[in-house]
Amino acid sequence: MNYEKLHSKYKNSSIQGRYLNLNSIESFSEFWKTKNKLEILGLSVQARPIYKFQIGSGTTKILMWSQMHGNESTTTKGLVDFMNVLQSNSEIAKAILKEYTFCIIPMLNPDGAFSYKRVNANEVDLNRDFQNLSQPESQILMQ
């Protein structure tokens, strides 16, 4: 398997730079919705939607999320590329989707992404909020 060819084939080149906010991924939402299950799980502190994309029919369920820290967008870019692979109808994608069901939250902290900050709009680091679950974003992730 040639990973460089796979990367160049499925990489979303429209997402560039370090600053990635909700508008960047919402442009793909209609495409995701038409091919698979896309839903809004809830809203952030500043009422921005938190999306979940679901694909696959396998018995093993995998939860993936990105941008828990709003200013860390690298994984979001990787998830978008991975979602492109899963929707490609390739033999690899078919085999993966037969075994697994993926639930993907491409941006957990859209308020932090908007302001390019690690924390959410209430100045809470969501990665430190798993015990208290004081923030709507943390509560959404734990549903």
Regions flagged by a language model, labelled:
Residues M1-I50:
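Short glycine- and acidic-rich boundary segments immediately preceding or forming the N-terminal edge
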